[in-house]
Amino acid sequence: MESSIAPPIDKKALQPQVAREVWKQELADAVRDPSELCDLLNLDSVVAEKAKKANRDFPLLVPRGFISRMRPGDLNDPLLLQVLPRLEELDDVPNFVSDPVGEQAARQGTGLIQKYHGRCLLLVTSGCAVNCRYCFRREFPYAESGASPSSFAAAVGKVALDSSIQEVILSGGDPLLVDDAILKDLIEKLALIPHVQRL
C-alpha cells in the first residue's frame, strides 16, 4: 500500500553535476535511466522495473530541473506522467497508427514536409530536451527524412524553387536544440527567399 506522505526530494541530487547555467550542460546531465528517476522521486522499485521494460523503444530523457517540479511519491503527478515510460506503451492497440498526423505521405525529402498549400515544415533536428510519452513523432524516421544540418541547403533550395511556399515552420524535435550559429545561418538563408513571408 502506498503511503500518502512521501519523504522530501533530495534537491542536491537533482542539480546538474557541473554547476553551470548552460542549457547544453543541463541536457547532458538529464536523467535517462528510469531507476534514477524513480529513486529521485521516492517511487517504488516495482515502478522502476516496469518503466525500464517500457523504455526500450522510446528512451526516457528528462532534465533535472523538470524533475524538481514533480511531487515526490506521487505516481499521478502530471509532470511525471508526461515522461515516465509505462508498460501500456507496449500494448498492441486496435487501429493504432505510427503516423497519426499523416506526415509520411507529405514528406518531400531533405527534411521537408508539406501537407498544405503555401506552407511547409522543415525538420531541423530529431531531438528534444524532454522525451514526452505522448509525442506524435516518436516513431518518425528522422534518419530517412534528412532532418539534419547537412540537409539544410537542399531543403532551402527546394523552398526557393517553389514560389507557392510563403510560410516555413521550423520543427523537429525542438529546433532550439540546434547550435545557434547553424540556426542563424538557416534563418538567414530562408530570409533571402522573396516569397517566404513567415517563419
Predicted segments with their positions:
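Flexible, acidic/Gly-rich N-terminal and inter-domain linker regions that tether
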Residues: M1-Q114
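Short pre-active-site segment immediately N-terminal to redox-active cysteine/selenocysteine motifs
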Residues: G127-N131
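Conserved Radical SAM active-site core
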Residues: L84, F96-L123, R133-L199
